[in-house]
Amino acid sequence: MTDSHQVIFYPVNNGDTSQIVLASGRRVLFDFCHRNTSEDSETPEINLNKRLTDELRDAERDYFDVVAFTHADLDHIQGSTDFFELQHAKKYQGDGRIKIQELWVPAAMLLEDADKDHQQEEFVLLRQEARHRLLEGQDILVFSKPQALADWLEPLLLARGEEPSARDHLFIDAGTIVPGFDLEKDRVEFFCHSPFIKHCEEGDIIRNSAALIFNVRFSAGGETYDYLEVGDAECSDLEDIVNITRYHHNGDRLEWNLFNIPHHCSYRALNEEKGERETTPTPPVRDLLLMGRRDAYLVSSSKPIPDVRDSYAQIQPPHIQARNAYERHLKDIGGRKFLVTMEEPNSNKPEPLVFEVSTGGVTKISGAIGGPAIITSNPPRAGLRAR
């Protein structure tokens, strides 16, 4: 098996969808945001439904090995309950729906509340799907096990004649390696940075704080390369990750060749204060940015971020002040480039950003997924990790 993997980011405006395609052919999809407007060829957002369906068809598949929803905000789940087959009800099955072999969700998604007027909201349908799979004991991993979730699950297991601990193997704690992928066999492993149990035990659940965050480590050509897959975290969440990871002597899990930056380039992932021209990261977040390796890439899943006067007054992300901070720190580490999904190759007709992870490093490439990819001349590669 050739050690050549791909990481793809799809241009879905201020939203998230990315995919890992392993050398073995296994596919892991993070989040799903299909914009209905994208079905109009005049809009810049990609028609995600068509794109993913075409990619799977070309690979002779009707499923993803893993679909991970980092959290339940609409810009991370929009259109998912129309696209994917759901096991909990027959009306969400068949008719060309794409299957999910294993669903990854934060515990917070199973604890979401909704009144009777919102039972058909997508986050509720995904909550029902996750609860169904967990209760059936198959095709799911749940990240963290807060007491509120145990209080819901254990009486139901007892009613089925099962032990309260019968689903413990389906819960994954922060600071551990996710089962099902092996660095030696699969050339990849997933280290869970977040969520922590406290994210669901301190009153109201804050989706962004309780979201999935991973260090994804690839093996290629005898070396390893690291990808930080981050949801809509804020600076306090990243500070916790940096401090706790270091405390447990896992500092290498903070290193990165590729970093999907949080929350569509929001300044709040760096500091609670935006700054006039540039956001100043808090010390732990600054440390995380400086853990990037030479020739590394930063990716913002967002609208374009032009450096013009109006951008500096922007209230909602993306924030030019955050971009300026990211680019400054990328320069400090000798990084390669800061890329925005809705800017590449241009803002009128953006295309998926495709990175190849292979012998020598992480390379931004162009070309159709599943077809022959054309590596740019003098390919820019994110450097090696010391072993």
Predicted feature residues:
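Flexible, acidic/histidine-containing loops and adjacent segments that form or flank the divalent-metal
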Residues: 1-5, 62, 81-236, 303-387
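Conserved beta-strand hairpin/beta-sheet module of binuclear metal-dependent hydrolase folds
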Residues: 2-62, 210-236
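Active-site-proximal structural scaffolding
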Residues: 13, 41, 76, 96, ...
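Short, solvent-exposed loop/turn and secondary-structure capping segments
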Residues: 18-20, 30-31, 40-42, 78-81, ...
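Short, glycine/charged-enriched secondary-structure capping and boundary segments
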Residues: 23-24, 44, 82-84, 118-119, ...
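Active-site neighborhood of phospho(di)ester-bond hydrolases with catalytic His/Asp-centered motifs
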Residues: 29-33, 63-77, 104-108, 227-236, ...
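Active-site metal-binding motif and surrounding structural segment of the metallo-beta-lactamase
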Residues: 42-103, 249-268
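Long, structured stretches of catalytic cores involved in phosphate-ester chemistry, encompassing
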Residues: 236-339
